């Protein structure tokens, strides 16, 4: 996942949420469903999740199954489920915006999206433009 350069506050929140989700097995279940085929379903938000901490916008390119793709007019996949689980931990409402892959970093850098996730490889060139978790 990538963040606007210098947005350490959001990146730190993500890293803390990721740590919790790894420890409680949520990430393993997501991988089990989409990659390994060992789980019956992907991530589902708890009914009582509090989303009072605002909105979180994810930029993606939903053409990279199993990481992000459309199913019944909804973006699903590993990255989408990871993002939902993180947003739930942060108490935020998630919006996922589908766009061309080459537009993701620009959307994050300009503030049109809070973060990007699209099976993106971390490269030296990209590390000059955005920060990665």
Outline where the language-model segments fall:
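Extended ligand-binding regions for polar small-molecule ligands
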Residues: 1-40, 81-89
């Amino acid at each position: 996942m990538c963040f606007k350069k210098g947005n350490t506050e959001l990146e730190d929140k993500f890293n803390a949420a990721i740590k919790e989700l790894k420890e409680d097995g949520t990430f393993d279940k997501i991988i089990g469903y989409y990659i390994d085929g060992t789980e019956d379903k992907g991530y589902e938000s708890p009914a009582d999740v509090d989303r009072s901490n605002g909105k979180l916008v994810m930029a993606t390119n939903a053409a990279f199954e199993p990481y992000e793709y459309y199913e019944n007019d909804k973006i699903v996949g590993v990255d989408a489920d990871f993002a939902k689980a993180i947003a739930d931990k942060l108490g935020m409402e998630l919006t996922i915006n589908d766009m061309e892959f080459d537009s993701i970093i620009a959307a994050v850098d300009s503030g049109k999206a809070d973060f990007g996730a699209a099976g993106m490889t971390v490269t030296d060139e990209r590390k000059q433009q955005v920060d990665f978790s």
